[in-house]
Amino acid sequence: MSYLFNNNSLGPVSEGGPLNISSYSSNKYVSGSPSFLQSNSLVAKFAFLIMVLILFILALRLGAWLLTWVFTPSSSPILINGMINAKQMMRIEQDPSAPGSKPIIRSVNENAGLEFTWSVWMFVDDFTYKQNEYKHVFHKGNDNINLSGDSIGLNYPNNGPGLYITPHTNNLLVIMNTFDKIKEEVTIKDLPMNKWVSVIIRVSNQHVLDVYINGVLTKRYQLKSVPKQNYGDVFVSMNGGFSGYTSELRYFDSAIGTNRIQSIVDAGPNMKMIGGDMTGTKPQYLSSRWYFAGTNDMYN
């Protein structure tokens, strides 16, 4: 067998002659049948369409999530993001189409039942102001403050909840509507003067209403029935409110835990004045009474 080398051939000389390098470029050696090539092209197109469809669905879901995140009301809105004069009435609209509204989402219904939390900071500098009346802190419901009789200053019938200072005393009154009783009440005694006080109203396990003062569980009350929530607006300082300041009114659609409660107390009130100027120096906050008071009235 002889070998022939030239520019166009490589390999042994056979009866068929040398195998030219140029023959590797021939369609006979590298091209498939037309039907095979066409089938590959269809598979590629189908795979591409599937990939585009998957990307479109992912983009659509992401867009829907972003729109929901942007336009859905917060589950824990800050209704008063700052401090107001407690004699200054404020109405917080619940109609999402109203300018400046801050809608409140209905409570989370856990396995044990309905639950939610309200948090507010109060500073009272004069208990003799409107001493013959209930002094309104805030309530959620209708606009119907009683202006006569023994219950001047109380809203009726909706308090979901309502917070007031009672006449002739320095006591706090929490009112909660329930389905079986129009008005269930919890009293917190001896609200201090000239100090910031954190008041947290928490409903858990559907029937348990807790009131925390400066992070301390001060009263636990067993509601007779399920709390009755409403779609009314939130009203602050109606009928002249009280003498002092209100700060950082906030709602949570769940029963917040003790760690979250403590973080609210540690953060303190928001001292940014809304709608006016604060006179005098910064008041001290966190009355020590609530840290060292007796525990006899904690659950009664």
Q: Where are the model-predicted features located?
A:
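Extracellular glycan-associated modules
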Residues: 1-300
